[in-house]
Amino acid sequence: MGMSNLTRLSEFILLGLSSRSEDQRPLFALFLIIYLVTLMGNLLIILAIHSDPRLQNPMYFFLSILSFADICYTTVIVPKMLVNFLSEKKTISYAECLAQMYFFLVFGNIDSYLLAAMAINRCVAICNPFHYVTVMNRRCCVLLLAFPITFSYFHSLLHVLLVNRLTFCTSNVIHHFFCDVNPVLKLSCSSTFVNEIVAMTEGLASVMAPFVCIIISYLRILIAVLKIPSAAGKHKAFSTCSSHLTVVILFYGSISYVYLQPLSSYTVKDRIATINYTVLTSVLNPFIYSLRNKDMKRGLQKLINKIKSQMSRFSTKTNKICGP
């Protein structure tokens, strides 16, 4: 193979969810709505938590950070996706592709570890309620937040640097709607052995570590709940955990389906499954966490009433200034 064929590609083409031109505008409308709902829903969760003193505790602290991470997570992927729906070329530069891959891995891992931190918090609240305030103090919360952020930055940097060392000399068409690791690796004409080994060892460990924490936490919760004598007490404990468990199943179920398989078997079905943990979980989180949570509902209602009041005052002042 000549040296001219080994030059680094300057851009990739993102094939997207569909190559049919008639699908592009409906998909654009659908994902624009999903993106706007994601931004609005998660932003309302953050504002409700920070404006209500009754929601100033570790559980809602982690939920507000998760909502912020979800906003960032979808923003890394969806805006470029929307542009490509209306574009004929559907290109992404090499540097932009690596940047998208990096931040996708960063916020994906932060989401994963935050779900583990929330499970630990629930475990302490249910299994050790009398020492909850002592155990889940400010220092503990900061550590549970600092570790996933620090780890996610270095974990993502490792994988992106390993991709950057590869040579792409055949096709530049990525069969995906964003620069995910596996579809990009499939384009490489140099050996991806090191990348695959790291993905199946360090990458797998980074996914399994928080998942194991969640499993252990919920096993302890289950044992503690079964010891509660009253049916009402058991129901209250289970309902407290149900929203978090729903998100965990959605997130880890789709991740396991996509990534716990050989690189060669990556197909269109994986592209669809990826939507679950990149887009759907982020848009569903505000609804899942608020629908069955009375405190969260109260906080959101209080925030909405406050916004309405401010808008009413602004409208009244505007009318006075403008006159009849």
From Swiss-Prot:
Under the heading InterPro entries, the entry gives: GPCR_Rhodpsn, GPCR_Rhodpsn_7TM, Olfact_rcpt
Q: Which residues does the annotation flag as glycosylated?
A: N5
User: Does this UniProt record's set of keywords contain Hydrolase?
Assistant: no
Where, in residue ranges, is this chain on the Extracellular side? 1-25, 80-100, 159-196, 260-271
**Residue stretches spanning the membrane:** 26-49, 58-79, 101-120, 140-158, 197-219, 237-259, 272-291
Which UniProt key words apply to this protein? Cell membrane, Disulfide bond, G-protein coupled receptor, Glycoprotein, Membrane, Olfaction, Receptor, Sensory transduction, Transducer, Transmembrane, Transmembrane helix
What is the membrane topology listed in the Swiss-Prot or TrEMBL record? Multi-pass membrane protein
Could you list which ranges are Cytoplasmic topological domains? 50-57, 121-139, 220-236, 292-324
The reply to whether Membrane figures as a keyword in the UniProt entry is yes
**Organism domain of life:** Eukaryota
Can you name this protein?
Answer: Olfactory receptor 1L3
Name of the gene = OR1L3
